[in-house]
Structures are given as C-alpha cells and as structure tokens.
C-alpha cells in the first residue's frame, strides 16, 4: 500500500500519531502554543474508533495526576502542555518517576520565564534534562527537528518509557508545533506488547 502523505502542523501530527499507535488516554489542558493537540484529538473523536479517552482537565495539575492514575493501571497515557503548564505538572511528574511508571509528556515550549511568550524557544532544555521536579530522577527526552519527527517520536517515546519504566517527554520548539510540513503518519497499530514489560519492583 502506498504511503499516505499529508500536510499538517506539528501539534496535529502528535495527535494523529497518538491515535494511530493506540494510546489509551490523553489528559490535557489548553495552553498556546500546544492547544492544537487537544483540539485535534477532540475533532477526531478517537473514543468512537479506538476507545481512546480524551479529557480536558480542570487544570494542569489535575491532568498530570490523571496521567499518574492511568499509568498506574497499566494504560498508555499522555499529556501535553507548554512551559508554565509543565512547571505546574512537576510534582506529578516526580511522583510518576518515583513509582517507575511509563507515560508521555509533550512540551511545546514557550520562551522566557513566568508566563513567557509564544515565540519559538528551547528555553526548557535544562529543566527537562535535569528531571524537572524534586528528587534524583531524569526524564527520557526526545527533541524533534521536524514535523515528521513529531509524529515519529510518539511511538518511540512510548517504547522507551515502557522499556525503562520512566516518563518520557517530547521537547518541541514552539515553531515546530505550529509550522506545516508533509508527514507520513505511522501505520495504525496497537502497542499492546508494551504492557508485557516487567512492572515496577516497588508496586
């Protein structure tokens, strides 16, 4: 079968890839410049086809704790946000890492401290590679350089998260989330084999 090449934004590529690889649940909260991830999932209605749960939480803190619950029950779950929203998630991310649970966090970065700007930036590099929240842990970090990699890294991130029992993060520049390029989306598959990995020794 010929590959299907589509034109879409990086944020949209994340959403479509998540549906196609069989993600069980997405819990998020709108914040620019990543809002299209949640919007695309809402438009595609994957709960009608794959059974994927898509839920807009009441806050970033609530969203990451929903991810914690989903990951603890053995589901493939993810969230997305942008810089100040990811800062609000840090305690939850630390708890998920401490419990040795796999999940995916997507950070489509803003620039600058505080609320920052919606200008393209790599401002959260140090926060991400040092783990983020309290405690001696690190995140598995993938940094896409194209819209194609935005789509490709969703499956790779889940593979690594389940293999190493650790949260993974896609750390994307805001411009990649917003720019449009041609993309070949992953074949629709279910990553059920990931759940066969050993569970945490601490559970």
Regions found by a protein language model. Give the residues of each.
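Thiamine diphosphate
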Residues: 1-131, 138
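Glycine-rich beta-alpha junction loops
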Residues: 110, 172-179
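Conserved small/polar residues in nucleotide/adenosyl-binding loops
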Residues: 192-199
